[in-house]
Amino acid sequence: MQAINRIIAPLKRGLQLLVSRAVVSVVNDAYARQNLQLRLQSEEVADDVERFQNYGHYSVPKAGEAIVVSVGGKRSHLVAVVVDDKSVRPAGLIAGDSVLYHLEGHQLRLTENGEAILSCKKFTIETDTLDCSAQQITFDSPQTTFTGNVDIMGISTATDHQSSGISGKNHDHEERVGKPVP
């Protein structure tokens, strides 16, 4: 039995070291693929660990935790497949929700019934043309500013329009034409 244990001991050790937890110490985003410095078991430090990310999404994490895989079972060839920081992870989501978030708290949350909720201090869109198609749009803001011309193609249903502080509803022309007729 000891002979068998001696034979399988290296295999067992290799399997145990195949997937590991780690703590992210340093992130280097200067390479084609992001590299990490990780602290693994006890005092083991791994430098230049490649971090793989999902196509179309990229992030630069702060210190956090990682799951690393030893490629080919070699501890000298580690790759990080997941990096996370549970201290800033959004909480309170329900099954099926998905969220893209920043450590400062702003986020885009996709929820049930086709709802997307964007929470942030400032939202900037940079595009040549913006087309918006909706059944209804509501702007709830104490101040709205348009820097260019505004063309209204439909009928304005506002009860009054003001220009330069003058009411269109109650305005009386100097030529004594009278107030606008409703």
From Swiss-Prot:
Name of one Pfam family that matches: Phage_Mu_Gp45
InterPro entries: GpV/Gp45, Phage_Mu_Gp45, Phage_Mu_Gp45_N
Compositionally biased intervals (Basic and acidic residues): 169-182
Residue ranges of the region described as Disordered: 159-182
Family label: To phage Mu protein gp45.
Protein name: Mu-like prophage FluMu protein gp45
Species for this entry: Haemophilus influenzae (strain ATCC 51907 / DSM 11121 / KW20 / Rd)
